[in-house]
């Protein structure tokens, strides 16, 4: 195993004493499925007596710095894996950034596992193998009955023990549990999950979500475009470090952005991937 687990030993008698059980997973993932290398970041799984939340550690870090130093920074989680659900539930509230908006939508994501007899040891923990198909991908999980939480990364839950390792068959997404801790208080995510640093999540449905994403793809610089007119030669707009002087240059940037969006179209739920047209 590449990463040494630094799991805090959680005694069964301690499960009801802390308000939040936090598990941190290292996520290795491919934004483009054809790439060889991986992006890496840490994801947080928070389990409270009533709710379960999964989100990027960058959100919590930014929120903590804002509170500590009176800052007003923001952070956009681009993993598409920010979710919240009630304990012991497959009904998820999903959170997503689209352009400058922040939205939430509901899904029911039942997971049917096939538990194998195969086991392995990681440090002092015995892990058991389980497989499932979810989101258009085939998944293998290794869970630990000694840690009696039926949770895991993202929406992958429902096993008789905490998931320590999780990966899809093509190794596009690889999760490894690296740390855990017990928080004495119910950790508030109100400023970065239920809202995104000042932008409260707007409830939508999945059909509306696809419409918003496609609108962004069709014209990713719609706001900038509204500020342009071909007769206004003095207006200059900076996009990704490049100075744009007219609509023709903006159109070139639009095509470049669309190429990037199509290239990095490898969501964890691949069966819900967007089918972007090429203009």
Language model features with spans:
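Bacterial Sec-dependent N-terminal signal peptides
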Residues: 1-23
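Functionally constrained cores in energy, signaling, and assembly domains
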Residues: 3-6, 19, 101, 115, ...
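Exposed boundary/loop context
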Residues: 7, 11, 73, 117, ...
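Extracellular or lumenal secretory-pathway regions
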Residues: 17-121, 126, 140, 171-279
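Glycine- and acidic-residue-rich phosphate-binding/metal-coordinating active-site segment common to enzymes
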Residues: 122, 126-183
């Amino acid at each position: 195993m590449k990463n040494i687990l630094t799991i805090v030993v959680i005694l069964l008698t301690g499960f009801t004493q802390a308000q939040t059980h936090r598990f941190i997973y290292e996520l290795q993932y491919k934004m483009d499925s054809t790439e060889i290398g991986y992006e890496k970041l840490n994801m947080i799984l928070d389990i409270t007596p009533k709710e379960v939340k999964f989100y990027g550690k960058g959100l919590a870090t930014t929120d903590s710095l804002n509170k500590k130093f009176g800052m007003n920074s923001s952070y956009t989680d681009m993993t598409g894996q920010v979710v919240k659900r009630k304990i012991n539930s497959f009904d998820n509230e999903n959170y997503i950034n689209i352009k400058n908006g922040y939205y939430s939508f509901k899904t029911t994501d039942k997971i049917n596992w096939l538990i194998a007899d195969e086991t392995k040891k990681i440090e002092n923990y015995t892990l058991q193998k389980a497989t499932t198909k979810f989101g258009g991908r085939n998944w293998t999980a290794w869970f630990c009955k000694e840690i009696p939480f039926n949770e895991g990364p993202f929406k992958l839950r429902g096993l008789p023990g905490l998931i320590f390792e999780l990966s899809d068959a093509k190794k596009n997404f690889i999760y490894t549990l690296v740390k855990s801790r017990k928080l004495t208080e119910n950790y508030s995510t109100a400023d970065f999950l239920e809202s995104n640093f000042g932008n409260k999540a707007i409830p939508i449905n999945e059909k509306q979500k696809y419409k918003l994403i496609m609108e962004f793809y069709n014209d990713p610089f719609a706001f900038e475009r509204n500020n342009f007119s071909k007769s206004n030669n003095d207006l200059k707009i900076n996009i990704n470090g490049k100075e744009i002087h007219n609509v023709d240059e903006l159109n070139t940037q639009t095509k470049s952005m669309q190429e990037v969006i199509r290239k990095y179209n490898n969501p964890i739920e691949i069966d819900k991937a967007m089918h972007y047209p090429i203009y």
